[in-house]
């Protein structure tokens, strides 16, 4: 089973999915005039309470829910594995891919808010399945996407959730995420910055090594062996594409219920999640590990790929405990975030009563996840999660003119008068 899943994943990566996602990222980056430059604006808007419209949760709560699902163990273990397999240069390609992914995240969240649907309890529902059915009239494709979302939520994480449904559940999940995301992020990043400060003398060299090994397979000093450039590119891009979920359609579901009057503004807020997840978290993790490897080369000989970050944190007081607690919080947050996505998809497929059935099955997967091999569980989850990208990107490309036209219009409308005359 494990070999089959591995072969299936590799076939997707090598031929179709990487090209599809990366191509979409680059396309929207170009067509939206490098919308990534509005990240500072998005950060400010995410903490603002001004001009909030209808919706179930605040823009910040929507962002926190998305971050809870995306900032997971992949940011730690995933980067460790990427460095072990693809060399330090993999961090560079992960970072670059994340930057391009910001544009796609904006596009999918824009559509989710633009075509969201108001439910009986006053909250809003949206995402690729609603866009595919109500706008593009592709119901079968919409059902396929929703089924993949439910399946992915079972694999990525399962936990005992409340049986209450409706607005109260969404609000509770959002409240937990608004508290949990800052706590776990500050705890983990605090440990990373402590180590970066401790290894300050070799940090510039670590950054240089990351950039150098992204383009050359020659060995570098400090006990870090060179790796084939193409391996580093493949591994780095794959981690960059999937750690932040840009293009998968999952983040858009939380954006749809945000209290907002503007799809453009919510899109800008939501795209900051990719910035925090990949550009910040993955970059900091990479620099922490590589600088530690340069400072303590002997300690990293014959070490398992998923233990690189643990080894780095072992060089600070209580570091391994800090990392362990961070991992537990990240995993718990992912469970909460993906349970919300699963409920959104189940509600679309079966109505509000279907959410109760989904929650019961979600509980059962706690046991299944414990008895199945970790490789099998994650292999299945990765496949479903990967396949979600296909119908989601279909909706993005078919509605690309709407996304581009309204984004450009909003930019002109809000630009200073001097710029409008140019």
Give the predicted meaning of each segment.
Residues 24, 28-29, 68, 97-122, ...:
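Helix-loop-helix module between adjacent transmembrane segments
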Residues 20-27, 35-44, 164-211, 346, ...:
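Membrane-interface loop-to-helix entry segments
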Residues 34-57, 81-83, 87-91, 95, ...:
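Flexible loop linkers connecting adjacent transmembrane helices
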Residues 1-69, 73, 83-90, 101, ...:
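N-terminal alpha-helical transmembrane segments of multi-pass membrane transport
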Residues 31-36, 74-79, 155-167, 171-175, ...:
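Transmembrane helix-loop junctions in multi-pass membrane proteins
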Residues 100-108, 171, 181-201, 234, ...:
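Selective recognition of specific alpha-helical transmembrane segments in multi-pass small-molecule
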Residues 53-85, 111-129, 133, 147-150, ...:
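Alpha-helical membrane segments and immediately flanking helix-loop junctions
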Residues 107-120, 191-209, 221-224, 257-260, ...:
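Extracellular/periplasmic helix-exit of transmembrane alpha-helices
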């Amino acid at each position: 089973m494990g070999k089959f899943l591995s072969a299936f994943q590799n076939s997707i990566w090598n031929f179709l999915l990487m090209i599809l996602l990366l191509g979409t990222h680059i396309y929207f980056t170009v067509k939206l005039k490098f919308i990534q430059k509005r990240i500072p604006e998005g950060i400010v808007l995410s903490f603002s309470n001004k001009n909030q419209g209808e919706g179930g949760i605040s823009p910040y709560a929507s962002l926190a829910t998305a971050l809870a699902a995306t900032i997971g163990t992949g940011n730690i273990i995933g980067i460790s594995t990427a460095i072990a397999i693809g060399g330090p240069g993999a961090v560079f390609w992960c970072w670059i891919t994340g930057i391009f992914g910001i544009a796609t995240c904006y596009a999918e969240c824009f559509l989710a808010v633009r075509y969201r649907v108001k439910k009986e309890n006053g909250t809003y529902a949206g995402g690729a399945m609603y866009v595919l059915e109500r706008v593009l009239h592709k119901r079968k494709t919409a059902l396929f996407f929703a089924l993949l979302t439910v399946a992915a939520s079972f694999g990525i994480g399962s936990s005992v959730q409340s049986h209450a449904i409706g607005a109260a559940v969404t609000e509770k999940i959002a409240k937990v995420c608004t508290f949990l995301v800052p706590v776990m992020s500050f705890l983990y990043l605090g440990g990373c910055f402590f180590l970066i400060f401790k290894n300050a003398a070799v940090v510039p060299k670590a950054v240089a090594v990351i950039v150098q090994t992204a383009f050359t397979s020659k060995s570098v000093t400090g006990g870090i062996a060179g790796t084939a450039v193409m391996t580093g590119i493949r591994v780095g891009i794959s981690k960059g594409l999937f750690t932040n979920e840009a293009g998968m359609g999952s983040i858009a579901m939380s954006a749809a219920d945000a209290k907002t009057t503007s799809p453009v503004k919510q899109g800008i807020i939501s795209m900051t999640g990719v910035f925090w997840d990949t550009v910040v978290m993955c970059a900091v993790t990479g620099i922490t590990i590589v600088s530690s490897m340069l400072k303590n080369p002997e300690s990293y000989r014959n070490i398992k790929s998923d233990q690189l970050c643990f080894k780095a944190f072992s060089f600070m007081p209580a570091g391994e405990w800090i990392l362990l607690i961070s991992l537990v919080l990240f995993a718990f947050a992912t469970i909460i975030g993906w349970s919300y996505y699963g409920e959104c998809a189940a509600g679309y497929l079966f109505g509000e009563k279907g959410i109760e059935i989904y929650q019961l099955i979600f509980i059962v997967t706690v046991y299944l996840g414990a008895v199945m091999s970790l490789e099998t569980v994650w292999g299945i989850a990765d496949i479903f999660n990967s396949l979600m990208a296909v119908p989601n990107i279909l909706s993005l490309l078919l509605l690309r003119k709407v996304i581009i036209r309204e984004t450009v219009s909003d930019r002109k409308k809000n630009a200073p008068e001097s710029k409008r005359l140019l």
